[in-house]
């Protein structure tokens, strides 16, 4: 993927969380001062002004669902694969967790260069950003081999970009890590196939579902993704595959009562109710060995 595309896709979730006023996202954005608007590529689409609202809903529910599961697991270390410009480091690390962010070179080089702007100088809880291609088993072994404590691995927004063989390579590496050191693997977005269309439909009504295909087409072109090759796109498929690979899998609703979601404040009561009902029918997964 070209450097510019990597930067744009990595910025989207941060921009959405910042627009909602999520505190650590606001601080992270202020520190980074990223340039450009990653949503500009969608400006030509119908309902373009409403699209950020839909995307921010998806960004927040996945981010908060993952965070809640990470805190429940309470493992001392967190490995955030395909971390992008996630503000999760500013939420988790001050609580005493060792945070490691991993992504492709353009993202990790940018974040590492800005470390002094992002983090306090005495941030002992921050283990750093690591460059890793999750589809390269040797790279995964190099990054994961340095860890020696129970860990929560989180993959938010990563699975839809990987082929079946690439997912299996990543899963095998994570399984070996968990067998050695203990911990779990948090997958917040296992119902990716329907999450986007159902969220757009709940927020925008009948016209929402119709725009999803055009949004997907823009994104697929940007990241050079072939949706015909996508697998593990439903929770049932992922549970089956991970079970076959030797994981013990626990499913939980994507949205759980008590989760605080700022995105709901801008919706009508009816739209919020539709959205929550949709999310409660979808899953996140915690896998262990």
Language model features: what each stretch is:
Residues 1-79, 83-130, 147:
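Rossmann-like AdoMet
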């Amino acid at each position: 993927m070209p450097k510019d595309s990597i930067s744009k896709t990595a910025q989207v979730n941060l921009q959405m969380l910042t627009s909602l006023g999520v505190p650590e996202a606001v601080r992270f954005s202020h520190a980074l001062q990223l340039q450009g608007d990653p949503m500009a590529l969608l400006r030509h689409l119908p309902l373009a002004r409403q699209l950020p609202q839909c995307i921010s809903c998806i960004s927040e529910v996945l981010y908060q669902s993952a965070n809640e599961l990470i805190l429940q697991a309470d493992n001392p270390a967190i490995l955030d694969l395909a971390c992008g410009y996630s503000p999760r480091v500013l939420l988790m690390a001050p609580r005493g967790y060792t945070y490691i962010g991993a992504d492709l070179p353009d993202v990790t080089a940018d974040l590492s260069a800005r470390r002094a702007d992002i983090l306090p100088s005495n941030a002992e809880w921050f283990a750093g950003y690591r460059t890793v291609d999750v589809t390269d088993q040797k790279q995964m072994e190099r990054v994961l081999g340095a860890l020696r404590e129970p860990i929560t691995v989180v993959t938010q927004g990563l699975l839809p970009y990987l082929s079946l063989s690439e997912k299996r390579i990543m899963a095998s590496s994570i399984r070996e890590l968990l067998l050695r050191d203990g911990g779990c693997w948090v997958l917040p977005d296992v119902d990716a196939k329907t999450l986007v269309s159902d969220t757009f439909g709940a927020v925008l009504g009948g016209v929402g579902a119709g725009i999803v295909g055009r949004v997907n087409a823009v994104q697929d072109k940007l990241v050079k993704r072939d949706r015909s090759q996508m697998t593990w796109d439903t929770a049932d498929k992922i549970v089956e595959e991970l079970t076959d690979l030797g994981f013990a899998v626990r499913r939980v609703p994507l949205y759980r009562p008590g989760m605080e979601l700022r995105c709901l404040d801008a919706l009508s009561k009816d739209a919020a109710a539709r959205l929550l009902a949709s999310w409660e029918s979808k899953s996140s997964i915690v896998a262990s060995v």
